[in-house]
């Protein structure tokens, strides 16, 4: 229950504080992997609480893993950075896939 409430609070903050920016694709040097920045985490979660970060990371992992299995994309890893949550794929993800991940995280209920 606590985890659900925290996720709801994060989602509510996201809808109140910012209008979601467009996802940004950046190519890593010397690698075929693509890093996809989903949203500016600092502007959504204003606390540095480890518990909140763990809940948020689990939420992102589950959403992206589910979408990867549905679209047969190959997931390499998900990284929760200081400024952003990102996931890395073996091949360049489609814009539709990025949009679906982005939308699913913000519209999680």
From Swiss-Prot:
GO MF assignments: ion channel regulator activity; toxin activity
Record keyword Signal present: yes
Function of the protein: Probable ion channel inhibitor.
Intracellular or extracellular location(s): Secreted
Protein name: U16-hexatoxin-Hi1a
UniProt keyword list: Cleavage on pair of basic residues, Disulfide bond, Ion channel impairing toxin, Secreted, Signal, Toxin
Main location: secreted
Organism this protein belongs to: Hadronyche infensa (Fraser island funnel-web spider)
Signal sequence, renumbered to the chain: 1-16
């Amino acid at each position: 229950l606590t985890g659900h409430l925290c996720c709801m609070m994060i989602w509510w903050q996201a809808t109140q504080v910012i209008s979601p920016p467009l996802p940004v694709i950046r190519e890593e040097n010397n690698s075929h992997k693509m890093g996809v920045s989903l949203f500016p985490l600092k502007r959504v979660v204003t606390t540095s609480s480890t518990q909140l970060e763990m809940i948020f990371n689990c939420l992102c992992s589950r959403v992206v893993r589910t979408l990867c299995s549905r679209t047969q994309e190959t997931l390499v890893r998900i990284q929760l950075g200081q400024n952003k949550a990102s996931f890395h794929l073996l091949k360049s993800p489609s814009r539709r896939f990025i949009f679906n991940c982005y939308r699913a995280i913000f519209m999680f209920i």
